[in-house]
Amino acid sequence: MKKLLMVQGTTSDAGKSVLVAGLCRVLARKGVKVAPFKPQNMALNSAVTKEGGEIGRAQAVQAQACRIEPSVHMNPVLIKPNSDTGAQIILQGKALTNMDAYGFHNYKKVAMDTVMDSFARLKDEYQAIMIEGAGSPAEINLRQNDIANMGFAEEADVPVIIVADIDRGGVFAHLYGTLALLSPSEQARVKGFVINRFRGDIKLLESGLDWLEEKTGKPVIGVLPFLHGLNLEAEDAITSQQALSDEVKLKVVVPVLTRISNHTDFDVLRLHPQIDLRYVGKGERLEHADLIILPGSKSVRDDLRYLREQGWDKDILRHLRFGGKVLGICGGYQMLGESIRDPFGVEGEPGESVGLGLLKTRTELTQDKCLINTKGQLSLNGKHVNVTGYEIHVGRSQVNEYQPITKDDGQLEGALSECGQIMGSYLHGFLDSEAALELICEWVNGVRIKAQNHQQLKEQAIDRIADAIEEHLDLSQLGI
């Protein structure tokens, strides 16, 4: 019999993604062939799958917890916002179209067919599926045609547990209120509650747990402790927590663009004890750094306009005058060039924007999206190191500069300015390659930094979650 379980939350960021990742690792360690599943995800941080499709990064991390390759069927509906009211809709890894919120709400009945198709494929292949909901199942205005939470659970007939973050406060109101707002049939499939991120003496919580169980008739399956320094990729909110030592060798600043994407590119910098990574927000200056990194963006021309509104273009020029280095990744790479054309209105109104003019490149946004995992060699300062990464972009750039990356298929990638201070690349995640990070640090200011094994750090984090789940949850109540 298949092991199926859906984790829903009282709020966004309640701990659904982490709990699913941990449950996946618990099962994988027992030899169970398990896969993650999230019917609908809204995120600007995405990953490339084995099929050359696109899914939310949380599902890619969960696949790692299962010790399998990520697949488009693990997240069949991905919504990538490109404005306050509109988003790109991605079905089974491929971009379908742009829709406003009302249009997608009406499209959900069609999207449910795609969701159930992917779910059926995973059920055919795996012994267990750990499913993640989205946001809260109790959003009254979103319940009609729901495909992300109870709408899916009812259609697929799967049991549900509800998780809440006690660190935010109000955990009993969150859990009791969420359950109360569900229909009788939805309430019946809730098997219990999990309380996440608890600090302190569990005895002080016991009276509240007893009250909750008495009022709802549902068991509290367990209370997970606050896991300090848990270094897993954040899907939405930018994480600024660092691991600094007294010996900082490199200072990096990243401007927070309005549609910043794949900020997980910078986790490897944030977690290094000798690198001081600082995110710079609205009204702040890009200063006191060795390296400025322009991140990816879901709306490159709009974010380029925003960058100029903040005066960051002037900060970049001043930084370069004093010998600093600038790196652009994906959308940030496009901004560094001479122009960005969007003749088809792929990311908004059709038109052309003047770039920062720091690289001799010209970019045209196309209707076909490049989705590929890439391996190659990075050549800087007369040194050559292996590099891996992934590409997710709709632009094609004409480059009239030295190209520092040679892909395994022989294609050249990226651009390095003649002055040697400015570099751009379409490769997300290439800083995760230890040798590449060390070479980039040496390029920036000549410092030698020993890179950490980023994959190993993620593995350790996943195992910590699984250990906590095995210790603090009554898994027998879940059949695990």
Swiss-Prot record:
GO biological process, one term: cobalamin biosynthetic process
Alphabetical list of InterPro entries matching this protein: Class_I_gatase-like, CobQ/CobB/MinD/ParA_Nub-bd_dom, CobQ_GATase1, CobQ_N, CobQ_synth, GATase_3, P-loop_NTPase
GATase cobBQ-type domain span: 249-436
Keywords: Cobalamin biosynthesis, Glutamine amidotransferase
Active site: C330 (nucleophile), H428
GO molecular function: ABC-type vitamin B12 transporter activity; catalytic activity
Pathway annotation: Cofactor biosynthesis; adenosylcobalamin biosynthesis
Similarity comment: Belongs to the CobB/CobQ family. CobQ subfamily.
NCBIfam families: cobQ (TIGR00313), PRK00784.1 (NF001989)
Function field: Catalyzes amidations at positions B, D, E, and G on adenosylcobyrinic A,C-diamide. NH(2) groups are provided by glutamine, and one molecule of ATP is hydrogenolyzed for each amidation.
The name this protein goes by in its record: Cobyric acid synthase
Gene: cobQ
